[in-house]
From Swiss-Prot:
Region (Involved in Mg(2+) ion dislocation from EF-Tu): 79-82
Protein name: Elongation factor Ts
Function: Associates with the EF-Tu.GDP complex and induces the exchange of GDP to GTP. It remains bound to the aminoacyl-tRNA.EF-Tu.GTP complex up to the GTP hydrolysis stage on the ribosome.
Main location: cytoplasm
Gene this protein is translated from: tsf
Keyword vocabulary terms for this entry: Cytoplasm, Elongation factor, Protein biosynthesis
Entries under PROSITE patterns matching the protein: EF_TS_1, EF_TS_2
Similarity comment: Belongs to the EF-Ts family.
Domain of life the protein comes from: Bacteria
SUPFAM superfamilies: Elongation factor Ts (EF-Ts), dimerisation domain, UBA-like
Keyword Ribosomal protein (UniProt): no
NCBIfam families on file: tsf
Native species: Sinorhizobium fredii (strain NBRC 101917 / NGR234)
Cell compartments where the protein resides: Cytoplasm
One GO CC annotation: cytoplasm
C-alpha cells in the first residue's frame, strides 16, 4: 500500500512522533493506522494515550438527573458561537430532560417527544437548525440507574446549569444516607473527569484492549535482549501496573493521591452509614475522538476541587 503524506500527517497528529518515524511505521504495517500506532509504541516513540481524548466538534454536553437515575447527552454544533446561544443551550437542557424518560440510547432519545414542540427530538433538532442557521446533531447519550442509591453527576467547564464541555455520571448502590452518598459520588465523578478510566474494575476492561497492551509490552520487552522467562515476568508486571492505572477503583484518588479511589469510598462508608458499590460510570467529552488542542483535565479538575 502506498503511504501518502496525508497518512503521515494523521499519524503524527495522533502520536506526536517524527515524520520519518511515522512514514516508516506506516510502511512496516502496510498503511494500517492502528497497527502503526502500536509499532511506534513498541519502539518507544509514541505514548498509548496520545491519540485519545482529542476534541474538535463544538456544542455542549448536557446532564439531567432524578436521584437514582441520570443521563448525559452530547449535542454538536458547527461553531462555539452557537454553543453560547441561549436557544441552543435551552435545547441541550431540554433534550437531556427528555432523555431521562428513555433508556439513554441515541435512538430512543431521538424518537422521544420533545415537549416544547410536540414533535420528536430528531425533528425538533431539525427545526432548530432552520431557526439558528447552523447544523447540529445529537451525537451521543448515556444513562445510569440504580434501584437503591444515587447517580452522582459532574459538569466540567460549565457553560450554565447542567451544561458544559465534559459530563460524568457515577452510579453508587447503597442503602445509606443519600446526601452523604451523593457527596462522595460527586468527588468520584470529578476524579473520572480527570482520569478517564476504562472501567470500574480490572475484570471489566475489554479483553481486546488488554491483549493489545500486552502485545505492545512484549515487543518493548524483547528489545531488552533478556531471556523469554524474564520477559514474561516483565510483561506481567507491566500489565498489573496497566490495570491499576486504568481501572477506577485502583487509581490514585485525584482529591487525595495518597489513597486509592476504592479506599476513599471505603472511608466514606462511615459517613454514609452503609456499604457502597460503584455500579457504573459514564463520561462524555465534547467532540471526543476528533482533532483539537488537548487540555490537562487532571490539573483542571484538581484545581476546581480545591477552589
Amino acid at each position: 500500500m502506498t503511504v501518502t503524506a496525508a497518512m503521515v500527517k494523521d499519524l503524527r497528529e495522533k502520536t506526536g512522533a517524527g515524520m520519518m518515524d511515522c512514514k516508516k511505521a506506516l510502511a512496516e504495517t502496510n498503511g494500517d493506522m492502528e497497527a502503526a500506532i502500536d509499532w511506534l509504541r513498541a519502539k518507544g516513540i509514541a505514548k498509548a494515550d496520545k491519540k485519545s481524548g482529542r476534541t474538535a466538534a463544538e456544542g455542549l454536553i448536557g446532564i439531567a438527573s432524578a436521584g437514582n437515575k441520570a443521563v448525559v447527552v452530547e449535542i454538536n454544533s458547527e461553531t462555539d458561537f452557537v454553543a453560547r446561544n441561549d436557544a441552543f443551550q435551552d435545547l441541550v437542557r431540554g433534550i437531556a430532560n427528555v432523555a431521562l424518560g428513555t433508556d439513554g440510547t441515541v435512538e430512543a432519545v431521538s424518537q422521544a417527544t420533545y415537549p416544547a414542540t410536540g414533535k420528536s427530538v430528531e425533528d425538533s433538532v431539525k427545526d432548530a437548525i432552520a431557526t439558528i442557521g447552523e447544523n447540529m446533531t445529537l451525537r451521543r447519550a448515556a444513562a445510569l440507574k440504580v434501584e437503591d442509591g444515587v447517580v452522582a453527576t459532574y459538569i466540567h467547564n460549565a457553560a450554565g446549569d447542567g451544561i458544559g464541555k465534559l459530563g460524568v455520571l457515577v452510579a453508587l448502590k447503597s442503602t445509606g444516607n443519600k446526601e452523604a452518598l451523593n457527596a462522595i459520588g460527586r468527588q468520584v465523578a470529578m476524579h473520572v473527569a480527570a482520569t478517564n478510566p476504562l472501567a470500574v474494575r480490572p475484570s471489566e476492561i475489554d479483553p481486546a484492549v488488554a491483549e493489545r497492551e500486552r502485545n505492545v509490552f512484549i515487543e518493548q520487552s524483547r528489545a531488552s535482549g533478556k531471556p523469554d522467562n524474564i520477559i514474561e515476568k516483565m510483561v506481567d508486571g507491566r500489565m498489573r501496573k496497566f490495570f491499576e492505572e486504568v481501572a477506577l477503583l485502583s487509581q490514585a484518588f485525584v482529591m487525595n493521591p495518597d489513597q486509592t479511589v476504592e479506599a476513599a469510598i471505603k472511608e466514606a462508608e462511615k459517613t454514609v452509614g452503609a456499604p457502597i458499590e460503584v455500579a457504573g460510570i459514564a463520561r462524555l467529552l465534547l467532540g471526543e475522538g476528533v482533532q483539537k488542542e488537548e487540555s490537562d483535565f487532571a490539573a483542571e479538575v484538581a484545581a476546581a476541587a480545591k477552589g
